[in-house]
């Protein structure tokens, strides 16, 4: 569950370069829901079944965050630091590939965050 919570908010705040207030935008909120939906699809394929209201529950958690609350990935981007992309988005992305799932939002955020992260490695 925590990995899903981190998947949505960390992806949006890091790519959008904004703290939690980024979810005040209806468009960003919908993108976040789509990222979470991809994550839920992966979890289900892994045999992890969440209640139907899980996506709404996670979005309610985000609504409770203060506008200026940043995530670890947001602060990593802000401070020009490497990201924990493989531990969050990368892990879920690899599971999606294993199950041959169509996860376009997850694929996109993983690709962008991985590209940012690669500037800190020699590979």
Give the predicted meaning of each segment.
Residues 1-40, 66-67:
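Active-site-proximal catalytic alpha-helix in oxidoreductases
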Residues 33-123:
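NAD(P)-dependent Rossmann-like dehydrogenase/reductase catalytic/cofactor-binding core
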């Amino acid at each position: 569950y925590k990995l899903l919570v981190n998947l949505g908010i960390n992806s949006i705040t890091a790519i959008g370069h904004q703290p939690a207030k980024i979810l005040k935008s209806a468009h960003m909120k919908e993108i976040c829901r789509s990222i979470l939906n991809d994550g839920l699809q992966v979890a289900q394929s892994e045999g992890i079944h969440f209640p139907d209201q899980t996506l709404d529950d996670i979005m309610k958690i985000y609504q409770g965050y203060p506008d200026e609350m940043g995530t670890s990935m947001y602060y990593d981007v802000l401070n020009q630091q490497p990201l924990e992309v493989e531990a969050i988005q990368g892990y879920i992305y690899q599971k999606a590939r294993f199950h041959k799932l169509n996860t376009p939002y997850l694929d996109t955020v993983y690709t962008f965050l991985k590209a940012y992260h690669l500037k800190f490695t020699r590979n």
